[in-house]
């Protein structure tokens, strides 16, 4: 592959080689699972170009993508238009493009078909902790572009009968089962599952992640510094509009009454067991 300083100098052969041989890494999740933390961690290697939610974010199209998996050509065109130039830029700079945008989750098959050597990380978090974090952010209560596009049950009657906890528990299970099945169809060299708790808790999972991405493991002290501080904490603006329903006081999962915890267990128990989580 020729070397170019600028993207607008890239020739057709370079573009074709990028699609076929370059290996961007897409970190897919439910959201509220450490996707911003993982970007800060990976950017410790200067060769990495890791992004959390670059624009276009595609937040309005998550639910549509989840319901139209059979329209692979349409999904592929959408993701090509949204990401081709970013990936090509990183490619000609000889950097490792990594994106941890939750909104790409249901575009995963399109990404795999478009970028033939792309790698995928399934990032997971305990279902109870996910529900708490998402509820505090107002997920499935806000009236916003994000909520308009968030994945939901196709059965509107059943969906309208569910409360916020039930909806978020359903979302955790639906998304993680989808990603589990997607990764299972990939060669082992192109897939990795990471639990947020393991990435926060020591060096082994972090080293496995860096190795998988083709990045160099940074100094232990730098890793520990990021592991030890909050990333992407909830912020409620003083002039927050009333269509936003954030709730910073939503209680931690361990403090829930048994009946509320059972809602999460009913929706998530089988998938949680597969991922070594206890409910």
Provide a role label for each language-model segment.
Residues 114-136:
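Conserved phosphate-donor/acceptor-positioning beta-strand/loop module used by diverse small-molecule
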Residues 28-30, 98-102, 124-125, 196:
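Short His-Asn-centered micro-motif
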Residues 25, 49, 119-121, 192-194:
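Hydrophobic/aromatic beta-strand patches that form the interior of the parallel beta-sheet core
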Residues 36-39, 58-60, 105-108, 128-133, ...:
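Short catalytic/ligand-binding loop motif for oxyanion handling, primarily in non-cytosolic enzymes
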Residues 34-47, 111-115, 193-218:
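PAPS/PAP-binding and catalytic site of the sulfotransferase fold
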Residues 1-91, 139-141, 243:
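PAPS-dependent sulfotransferase catalytic core
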Residues 88-110:
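Glycine-rich phosphate-binding loop used to anchor ATP phosphates in small-molecule kinases
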Residues 1-25, 158-169, 173-193, 203-279:
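PAPS-dependent sulfotransferases, especially Golgi type II membrane carbohydrate sulfotransferases
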């Amino acid at each position: 592959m020729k070397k170019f300083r600028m993207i607008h100098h890239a020739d057709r052969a370079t573009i074709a080689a990028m699609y076929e041989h370059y290996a961007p890494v897409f970190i897919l999740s439910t959201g509220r699972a450490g996707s911003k933390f993982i970007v800060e961690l990976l950017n410790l290697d200067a060769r990495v170009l890791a992004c959390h939610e670059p624009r276009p974010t595609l937040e309005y199209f998550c639910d549509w993508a989840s319901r139209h998996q059979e329209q692979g050509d349409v999904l592929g065109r959408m993701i090509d238009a949204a990401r081709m130039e970013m990936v090509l830029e990183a490619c000609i700079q000889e950097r490792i493009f990594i994106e941890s945008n939750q909104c790409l989750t249901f575009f995963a098959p399109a990404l795999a078909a478009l970028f033939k050597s792309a790698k995928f990380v399934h990032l997971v978090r305990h279902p109870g902790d996910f529900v708490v974090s998402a509820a505090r952010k107002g997920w499935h209560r806000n009236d916003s572009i994000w909520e308009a596009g968030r994945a939901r049950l196709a059965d509107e009657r059943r969906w309208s009968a569910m409360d916020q906890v039930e909806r978020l528990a359903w979302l955790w299970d639906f998304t993680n089962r989808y990603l589990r099945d997607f990764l299972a169809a990939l060669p082992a060299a192109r897939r990795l599952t990471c639990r947020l708790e393991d990435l926060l808790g020591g060096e082994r999972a972090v080293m496995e992640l860096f190795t998988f991405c083709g990045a160099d493991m940074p100094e232990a002290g730098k890793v520990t510094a990021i592991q030890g501080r909050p990333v992407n904490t909830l912020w409620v603006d003083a002039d927050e509009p009333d269509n936003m329903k954030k709730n910073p006081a939503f209680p931690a999962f361990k403090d829930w009454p048994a009946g509320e915890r059972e809602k999460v267990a009913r929706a998530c128990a089988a998938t949680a067991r597969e991922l070594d989580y206890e409910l």
